[in-house]
């Protein structure tokens, strides 16, 4: 919902799990949101440029967050040649 100035006034903005594409519930206190900064040629972070991944508590509880994060980063071109047990 927006106020008369056009600003968001919602207390909760729903997110989707990047690994499973399911909505993360408001009471999922085990979920995490990870920002990975984009870097320039010198290895310095570019201010304000990052890629965000949200992982639900269910993915973390099953121990699949590491493999999921590697898969997502490979799909976005951040990692190359990462060994995966599922291959």
Swiss-Prot record:
Transmembrane intervals: none
Key words of the record: Cytoplasm, Ribonucleoprotein, Ribosomal protein, rRNA processing
GO biological process entries: rRNA processing; translation
Protein's UniProt keywords contain Cell inner membrane: no
Molecular-function annotations in GO: structural constituent of ribosome
UniProt subunit comment: Component of the small ribosomal subunit. Mature ribosomes consist of a small (40S) and a large (60S) subunit. The 40S subunit contains about 33 different proteins and 1 molecule of RNA (18S). The 60S subunit contains about 49 different proteins and 3 molecules of RNA (25S, 5.8S and 5S).
Role summary: Required for the processing of the 20S rRNA-precursor to mature 18S rRNA in a late step of the maturation of 40S ribosomal subunits. Has a physiological role leading to 18S rRNA stability.
Protein name: Small ribosomal subunit protein eS21
Species name: Candida glabrata (strain ATCC 2001 / BCRC 20586 / JCM 3761 / NBRC 0622 / NRRL Y-65 / CBS 138)
Gene it is expressed from: RPS21
């Amino acid at each position: 919902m927006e106020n008369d100035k056009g600003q968001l006034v919602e207390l909760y903005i729903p997110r989707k799990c990047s690994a499973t594409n399911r909505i993360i519930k408001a009471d999922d206190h085990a979920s995490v949101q990870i920002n990975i900064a984009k870097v320039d040629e010198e290895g310095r972070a570019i201010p304000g440029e990052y890629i965000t991944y949200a992982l639900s508590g269910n993915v973390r509880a099953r121990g699949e967050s590491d493999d999921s994060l590697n898969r997502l980063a490979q799909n976005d071109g951040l990692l190359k040649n990462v060994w995966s047990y599922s291959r």
